[in-house]
């Protein structure tokens, strides 16, 4: 039998009573299970009498194991019976007496109740997309940069040049002066083919530890193609004007996507800010751990451990700010997740089979696998979460249409 003793926001105090006959049956099952695994001198494995096993293991230890087993068995039944959706729980009281039932009290952090703000009255302050001629010209210039060629020049090296050099050890390699370390760039600027220069090598503190004799073999510069009809045709445009129109249309599509994404972001942030909810601490801690795991993965790819990164923040006196920012970001993400979930519950959009299949195909492409492999990797529960995410996406889009 289970009953709610006290309820305050997300925190629910629950009392569970287990009848004596079930306690007795669980104790006997526990003893038999242990007897099959415990070695008792003078008996073959699994053949020692239960009383002997009980005496060997000690009744107090057995009763502690019994309490844990009973909680494991009855807690899920109790929360189902009471209609709770726990995110965390702990047992705060236990009472197990000889020949009687087992009673315990658990403090449950229940999934929070959420109330949305009046989102239909939202005014989203997002500037509409605009594509200027200046943006078109910049995009065309970037195209020229992308199709530029390196050509040799017989002059001194300038800031954006590329040098091909050979060290005294015989190693030959190119150096892009625009991306070179400042002390390397300084040593090579103004040099031409045939010049020999001593390039300093610095330690972690920026101190010179030695010099490397380096010969400049060749100086090259980027030659940009002319923005003309011929260049347009190399990009499969019919004319220069056609190329400009294509670039303009591409920029408009990008601007429209950015605008829609900005509207969605502004809507969700406003929705989350106005959410009436008391979030259980365990949900926030879980999201903080999730964020730290992602950070650790990013740092690992750079050859840095999370521990070393946090220690460096501590040395610089920035650890407290990092932790505070982490807490704020975790709360923001949890609030947005709860807001999306509640909005989908309110609008209840339907996901057609065609939409679901298209979503699966897009997800499979993103993961670089087939739809069949995606289904296998995600499993039934993972696919259910994926479908719920699609349903929530549809709810957000429906809400944005309402706002116009």
Curated annotation (Swiss-Prot):
Entry's Gene Ontology cellular component terms: cytoplasm
Chief localisation class: cytoplasm
Entry's localization field: Cytoplasm
Organism superkingdom: Bacteria
Pfam annotation, one family: Trigger_N
Keyword Ribonucleoprotein: no
Its EC number(s): 5.2.1.8
GO molecular function, one term: peptidyl-prolyl cis-trans isomerase activity
Keyword annotations of the record: Cell cycle, Cell division, Chaperone, Cytoplasm, Isomerase, Rotamase
PANTHER family found in the cross-reference section: TRIGGER FACTOR CHAPERONE AND PEPTIDYL-PROLYL CIS/TRANS ISOMERASE, TRIGGER FACTOR-LIKE PROTEIN TIG, CHLOROPLASTIC
Functional summary from the UniProt entry: Involved in protein export. Acts as a chaperone by maintaining the newly synthesized protein in an open conformation. Functions as a peptidyl-prolyl cis-trans isomerase.
Name assigned to this protein: Trigger factor
Annotated organism of origin: Thermus thermophilus (strain ATCC BAA-163 / DSM 7039 / HB27)
């Amino acid at each position: 039998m289970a009953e709610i003793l006290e309820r305050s926001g997300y925190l629910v105090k629950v009392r569970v009573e287990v009848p004596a006959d079930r306690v007795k049956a669980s104790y006997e099952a526990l003893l038999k299970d242990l007897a099959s695994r415990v070695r008792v001198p003078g008996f073959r494995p699994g053949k020692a009498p239960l009383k002997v096993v009980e005496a060997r293991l000690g009744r107090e230890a057995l009763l502690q194991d019994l309490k844990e087993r009973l909680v494991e068995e009855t807690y899920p039944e109790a929360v189902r019976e009471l209609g709770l959706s726990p995110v965390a729980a702990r047992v705060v009281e236990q009472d197990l007496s000889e020949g009687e039932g087992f009673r315990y009290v658990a403090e449950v952090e229940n999934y929070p109740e959420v109330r949305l703000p009046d989102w239909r009255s939202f005014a989203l302050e997002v500037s509409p997309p605009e594509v200027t001629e200046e943006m078109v010209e910049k995009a065309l210039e970037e195209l020229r940069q992308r199709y530029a060629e390196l050509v040799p020049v017989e002059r001194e090296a300038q800031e954006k040049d590329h040098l091909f050099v050979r060290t005294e050890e015989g190693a030959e390699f190119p150096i892009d002066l625009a991306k070179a370390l400042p002390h390397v760039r300084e040593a090579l600027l103004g040099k031409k083919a045939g010049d020999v220069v001593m390039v300093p090598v610095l330690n972690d503190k920026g101190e010179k530890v030695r010099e490397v004799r380096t010969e400049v073999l060749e100086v090259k510069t980027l030659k940009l193609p002319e923005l003309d009809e011929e260049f347009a045709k190399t990009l499969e445009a019919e004319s220069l004007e056609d190329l400009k129109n294509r670039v303009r249309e591409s920029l408009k599509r990008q601007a429209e996507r950015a605008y829609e994404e900005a509207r969605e972001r502004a809507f969700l942030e406003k929705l989350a800010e106005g959410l009436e909810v008391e979030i259980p601490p365990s949900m926030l801690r879980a999201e903080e751990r999730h964020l730290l795991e992602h950070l650790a993965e990013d740092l690992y790819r750079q050859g840095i451990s999370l521990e070393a990164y946090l220690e460096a923040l501590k040395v610089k006196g920035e650890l407290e700010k990092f932790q505070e920012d982490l807490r704020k970001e975790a709360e923001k993400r949890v609030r947005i997740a709860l807001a999306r979930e509640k909005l989908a519950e309110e609008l209840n959009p339907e996901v057609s089979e065609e939409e679901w299949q298209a979503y699966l195909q897009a997800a499979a492409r993103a993961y670089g696998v087939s739809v069949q492999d995606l289904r296998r990797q995600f499993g039934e529960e993972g696919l259910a979460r994926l479908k719920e995410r699609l349903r929530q996406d549809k709810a957000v889009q429906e809400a944005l249409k309402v706002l116009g």
